[in-house]
A protein has these predicted regions:
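Active-site phosphate/ATP/adenylate-binding loop shared across adenylate-forming ligases
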Residues: 47-176, 182, 186, 191-197, ...
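Nucleotide 5′-phosphate-binding alpha/beta core
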Residues: 1-96, 100-102, 331-333, 337-394
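Active-site glycine/GP-rich loop and adjacent strand/helix microenvironment
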Residues: 2-13, 134-394
Length: 394
């Protein structure tokens, strides 16, 4: 039976690990309220400060995978992942049978600028005994490429949902079919229409696994059942809390290069407990950022570009949708009567040049448009406030 998660329920099982990892022995004697009142929340700014302090590690005997994230949503964050010794997340992936020796995986993660997910997933999968094939640019895949994938019995797809769908579309255009029995997605939620495409293509028995992750922590939870909106927390690695409707995580082992102590993920979720299993459902980003093709884009990033054309404060609403060809669309609503038709075109062009949006357009995965709309028609909350972001993608 599911019960509402309360931090006090699991505190006694994690406090000694936290005390040891962070060299704070007093924590072993604390109650959970003492912990939450005594240890401050670690925000992005605090993480970045520790990030700067980690540079000396690059001259140590260990090797690291170096990635940079969130370039369009604020300060470029450097993320380090251990490449020597125990490989990150391997024990959990083996325990949950995410990867195994019979897997031949097509890695669909786009090899983007300074992007680490491609190498990270390959590293974890290979450490579990799986075979890895890096796919690269979908736009140049030919029939012989699919024949080569069939020859080596490719049976697993790994990637962001939109990349998985794009790969399927190219495969179908070439009139080829891989015998895929497992699909592993990360980077964003799997939408209902995407799940339907995967099932219709590879059959109802295909196993779909979601990885809930962030660049600072790596993989935090897996969705293993039919409901890919319900995630099982990796309780051997993380202690989770709720703070002002946000999720906080604390590392329980030293696999994170920068251990996290009450780190604010910025996401919200419902948390429940079933035996020793902690489940996360209805995971949502905060309402001033959105996930577009696996990238987190801040509302303020869009606003800053609009203000170049009109410095005064105006209401801007962002609508997210899916086109008939399954490409994702960002539609930026601006008030009528402020911009000339020429300015609208220039604004649309500059917004499209935001790196992650531009890349999605170049890869034919998504695009952006600007529409003039009377603010009276803007979508509002039940309290009558104009919403920053309206997500109609599912």
């Amino acid at each position: 039976m599911l019960s509402i998660y309360k931090e006090e329920m699991v505190w006694n099982t994690v406090k000694d690990k936290i005390a040891t990892l962070f060299q704070l022995p007093a924590i072993s004697q604390w109650t959970y309220p003492q912990f939450s009142q005594s240890i401050p929340v670690m925000e992005k700014k605090g993480y970045l400060a520790k990030n700067d302090q980690s540079l000396h590690l690059l001259n140590s005997k260990n090797s690291y995978l170096i990635g940079f994230t969130s370039g369009t949503s604020g300060t470029l964050k450097r993320c380090l992942y251990k490449m020597s010794g125990d490989v990150y997340n391997v024990k959990e992936c083996e325990e949950y049978n995410i990867f195994c020796s019979t897997d031949t995986c097509a890695n669909l993660f786009t090899i983007n600028l300074l992007f680490s997910a491609h190498c990270l997933f390959s590293n974890v999968a290979s450490a579990c005994g799986a075979n890895i094939i890096s796919i690269g640019d979908f736009n140049v895949l030919a029939s012989e490429h699919f024949d080569a994938l069939i020859d080596v019995n490719t049976n697993v797809l790994i990637g962001i949902p939109c990349e998985i769908i794009q790969f399927i579309q190219v495969m179908q255009k070439k009139e080829k079919l891989l015998a895929i029995n497992k699909v592993i997605f990360a980077g964003e939620a799997l939408k209902a229409y995407q799940r339907e495409i995967i099932k219709n293509t590879f059959g109802n028995d295909v196993h779909i696994i979601g990885a809930y992750a962030c660049s600072e922590a790596g993989i935090i939870a897996f969705s293993l059942g039919e409901d890919n909106n319900s995630y099982e927390l990796l309780t051997n690695q993380f202690f989770i809390e709720r703070y002002q409707d946000r999720l906080l995580i604390t590392s329980l082992d030293n696999m994170n290069v920068i251990p996290l102590l009450r780190y604010n993920l910025g996401d919200s979720a419902d948390i429940s407990l079933k035996g020793n299993i902690i489940r996360l459902t209805n995971i949502k980003r905060n309402n001033i950022s959105f996930n577009f093709m696996g990238y987190i884009i801040e509302y303020e990033t869009i606003v800053a570009v609009v203000h170049k054309f009109h410095p005064a404060d105006i209401s801007i609403q962002i609508h997210l949708s899916v086109a008939k060809d399954t490409r994702e669309v960002i539609t930026v609503w601006v008030p009528t009567g402020i911009f000339s038709p020429q300015q609208i075109k220039l604004l649309e062009k500059e917004l499209t040049e935001i790196p992650d949006i531009y890349e999605s357009k170049q890869l034919n995965q998504g695009y952006l448009v600007v529409n003039e709309v009377d603010p009276i028609q803007y979508i509002r909350s039940v309290r009558g406030k104009i919403l920053y972001i309206v997500d109609n993608r599912d």
